[in-house]
Amino acid sequence: MFSDALMLLPKALGETVYMVAVSMIVASAIGIPLGVLLLATGKNQVLELGIANKTLSAIVNCVRSIPFIILMVAIIPFTRLIVGSSIGTTAAIVPLIIASIPLIARLVETSLREVPYGLIEAALSMGATPYQIIRRVLLPKAMPSIVAQLTTVI
């Protein structure tokens, strides 16, 4: 009996690694820019767009507050539309991605907030554009924290 369960372990481990890897890659590709956008459009930030920030923040907060099992059941039709099935390893990736995107976005936003505002002011005084501030000041300074936060999500 134990040997039968042991035989299933490599396949189950492979499926788990597949689900985690794909969902983290896709969720990070969407969540990191979303987190940057959440920070950049905030009050007293480089792109200050109050309505966009409040809307994005509300969506992120709403999705983060839904328990995963309820989210998984609620998006079964969407999962069927994307994958063609609502069961299986590949079908489980869709709700994992949807649940991970807001979490990653909020963690990235938090990491970016840790960058001292004096660095942003210095870049602004030297004539940097909002894109340059994000790419050359915020992201490099926050990268160690972002990587640490992403390992938490995994």
List PLM regions with ranges.
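Structural signal for alpha-helical transmembrane segments and their membrane-water exit/capping regions
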Residues: 1, 35-44, 79-81
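Periplasmic/extracellular loop-to-transmembrane helix junction in inner-membrane transport proteins
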Residues: 1-23, 49-57
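Transmembrane alpha-helix signature in integral membrane proteins
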Residues: 9-40, 150, 154
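Loop-to-helix entry region at the N-terminal start of transmembrane alpha-helices
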Residues: 11, 15-19, 64, 68-103
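Transmembrane alpha-helices
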Residues: 17, 21, 130-154
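Membrane-embedded alpha-helices of multi-pass transport/permease systems
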Residues: 29-36, 90-94, 98-120, 147, ...
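Cytoplasmic-entry segments and transmembrane alpha-helices of multi-pass inner-membrane transporters
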Residues: 37-74, 96, 101, 106-110, ...
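Short helix-to-coil transition segments within interhelical loops
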Residues: 112-142
